[in-house]
Every structure is written in structure tokens, then in C-alpha cells.
């Protein structure tokens, strides 16, 4: 299995998020996720833009917060 086949996927009736390796995450997605996370959870969050774990964790925390 190559790296491109690995992904995290969350799905519910409101949204589907499928995020691959960091090179597969668009800068627009990162910007929007960062904006929402700062508004809803932590204004001081400044992720490493190349750390996929930062974004996966942010998605997980938002899903928990909004009970998605």
C-alpha cells in the first residue's frame, strides 16, 4: 500500500471530510480549518502547516465539539 492510499475519513449527514497525506490538503482547506478552529476552540492555535497530525487532531476536536 502506497502513501497515497492512506487517509482519514469522517462522514455524517452534514459533511464528508477525507484528508490524505499533507500534500493532499489544499491551502484553502487549511486556512478554513484554522479559521473555524480558532473561532470555536482555541484562538491561539498556530499549527505547523506541514504537520498532518495537527490538522487531523483539529478535525477530530471539531467533530467532538459539534457532536458530528
Where are these regions (language model features)?
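Short intrinsically disordered terminal tails
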Residues: 1-5, 64-68
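Acidic, low-complexity, intrinsically disordered interaction modules
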Residues: 9-66
Amino acid at each position: 500500500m502506497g502513501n497515497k492510499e492512506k487517509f482519514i475519513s469522517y462522514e455524517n449527514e452534514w459533511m464528508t471530510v477525507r484528508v490524505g497525506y499533507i500534500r493532499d490538503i489544499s491551502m484553502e482547506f487549511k486556512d478554513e480549518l484554522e479559521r473555524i478552529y480558532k473561532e470555536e476552540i482555541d484562538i491561539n492555535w498556530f499549527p505547523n502547516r506541514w504537520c498532518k497530525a495537527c490538522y487531523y487532531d483539529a478535525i477530530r476536536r471539531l467533530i467532538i465539539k459539534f457532536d458530528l
